[in-house]
Amino acid sequence: MPALRRLFALLSDLRLAILLLLLIAGASALGTILPQNEAPDLYLERFNADPWLGMINGEQMLQLQLDSIYSSVWFLSLLAWLGLALILCSWRRQWPALLATTRWIDYRQPRQLSKLALAESILCSNGESALDTLSEELQKQGWQVQRNEDRLAARRGVIGKVGPLLVHTGLVLLLIGAAWGALSGNRLERFLAPGRALDLLDPSGNNRLSLTLERFAIERDPAGRTEQFRSTLRLDPPGGPSEQRMISVNHPLRYRGMTVYQADWSLAAITVQIGKSPELQLPLRSFPELGEQIWGLVLPTRPDGSEPVLMSTSSEQGPVQVFDADGSLLGNLRPGGASTEIKGLPLRVANIMPASGLLLKRDPGVPLVYAGFAITLLGGGLSLIATRQLWAVLDPAPFQPSNRKLHIGGLCNRNLAGLAAELPRLISRVDESRD
């Protein structure tokens, strides 16, 4: 039992909770620095050649679960440990403190008041009248008053004691929501070309929703830089009516617990005409070795596949640059423009099809996270309310029956200086009533 009590005391220690918060904050910051939820080959290729911090290679990063920090065993264990520490701290400290505040403390002797942080005494010709005046004045100022024959107790701001308990409750809900989202949430990134659909299945394999990209538009400034991109989506739930929604950067779509973000854009295909051939739609792929946002394809110019040329572009507006095998520029083609002779063949670009980069997230813990955050804010605001307590006791044994001393004392959990300034004003009101 002593060992169990020591363990209980350790787990409910506020210093431990603060340490766990710092560790979780550090791990969360680490997750923003390191790439998360990528293919294992990416970590092996990137960090085996250049170890992180000079000592953690790709294999060690995968073993330490640094590729998926927010759903790793050690991160979720930290969340569970912090949640347990907050629950035990609330049970051991905050709940008893709240119960103690709701109970009236009945001080009967003046010497008990003299030990309080604030204590004053005044001589009254009519002690009962002075107590009545003090009681009325306190009630006018919003104090709760408990009046007895020769004494009174008053308190104000008791709701402030609820604040710390609400903060702990909100943090626990936030942690539960974060853990639930990490364990049960889903994340999917896809590029869709206009007219293409994405079928979303439930865990049983049944079609839950069909998502079709009807239109995709990229807005650019006069210099050609991307300013905004928008997708018009059609949602087809099984057995339900279709809905059309538009999303853009910073304006996602929320639908039945799922959130669809406009995350990126790409180029999907190019439509070309070679000589008198029909228009051919050919897929594009990215060429990171040529630049950050460069797409293209290798196109043979002879029936036997020889003498290929590289067609590359960085925008759906063009131009499309055509390079020979030795890297020399053969020409620039504009989408929708006239054909240009390339190696003896007329080559025309009809259009370039952009693709919308969609990020789909389903996080069942989000409502709990929001609720926990709101409760934490509410508790933090209530915690700022000072809880004040005041007692007044008439001297039980006056030397002269007509003159009795009224002893007044008070406590405050914060802003004691404010109560110290308020106490003389209360005493002055009592003095005025005697005159």
Swiss-Prot record:
Residues spanning the membrane: 14-34, 72-92, 162-182
Cellular localization per UniProt: Cellular thylakoid membrane
Membrane topology: Multi-pass membrane protein
Disulphide bridges, residue numbers: none
Origin: domain of life: Bacteria
Main location: membrane
Xref: HAMAP family: CytC_Ccs1 (MF_01392)
Family statement: Belongs to the Ccs1/CcsB family.
Protein name: Cytochrome c biogenesis protein CcsB
Gene source species: Synechococcus sp. (strain CC9311)
Gene expressing this chain: ccsB
